[in-house]
């Protein structure tokens, strides 16, 4: 019986490349010359540091652009509030890994409401979709791509 998994993952290598490119771009930008600003990647967390709140938003825009160039979906970013400490502003950005249980339930509900003849099962941080026809599975893929669930999804483990 054909099946596939719906997962939400961020490629850590591409994430590191995007942060490195953003750091290089930061070094060449005229408006950041002589400014204490930086990106710091630790695991799946990026810490941004700048001297001003406006510069912090500029750094987030630089990072978003570089993530898009590297093929990392910016919807996976979970941007925390800016923290002011001393003369610097800091902001943490986490990246969502895995399908959250609330979003998974929302996905299952959406799939069942579409009346496509498939079964959806939540398996930890992923969803397994099973159906009798490949066309039904492709219809579910299209449905998930069109829906706005606040998180990017990838389709893996397609079995026929």
From Swiss-Prot:
One of its GO terms (cellular component) is cytosol. CDD domains: YajQ_like (cd11740). Keywords: Nucleotide-binding. It comes from the Bacteria. GO terms for molecular function: nucleotide binding. Coiled coil: none annotated. InterPro entries: DUF520, UPF0234-like_C, UPF0234_N, YajQ-like_sf. Pfam families: DUF520. The keyword Nucleotide-binding applies. The keyword Amino-acid biosynthesis does not apply. Nucleotide-binding protein. Belongs to the YajQ family. This is Nucleotide-binding protein VFMJ11_1323. It comes from Aliivibrio fischeri (strain MJ11).
């Amino acid at each position: 019986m054909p099946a596939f998994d719906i997962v939400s993952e961020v490629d850590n290598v591409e994430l590191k490349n995007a942060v490195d490119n953003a750091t290089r771009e930061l070094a060449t930008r005229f408006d950041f010359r002589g400014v204490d600003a930086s990106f710091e990647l630790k695991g799946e967390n990026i810490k941004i540091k700048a001297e001003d709140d406006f510069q912090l938003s500029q750094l987030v825009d630089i990072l978003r652009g570089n993530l898009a160039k590297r093929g990392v979906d910016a919807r996976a970013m979970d941007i925390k509030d800016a923290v002011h400490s001393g003369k610097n502003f800091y902001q943490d950005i986490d990246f969502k890994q895995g399908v959250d249980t609330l979003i998974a339930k929302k996905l299952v509900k959406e799939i069942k409401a579409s009346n496509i003849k498939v079964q959806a099962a939540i398996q930890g941080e992923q969803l397994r979709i099973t159906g009798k026809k490949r066309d039904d599975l492709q219809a579910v893929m299209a449905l998930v791509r069109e829906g706005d669930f606040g998180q990017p999804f990838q389709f893996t483990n397609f079995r026929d």
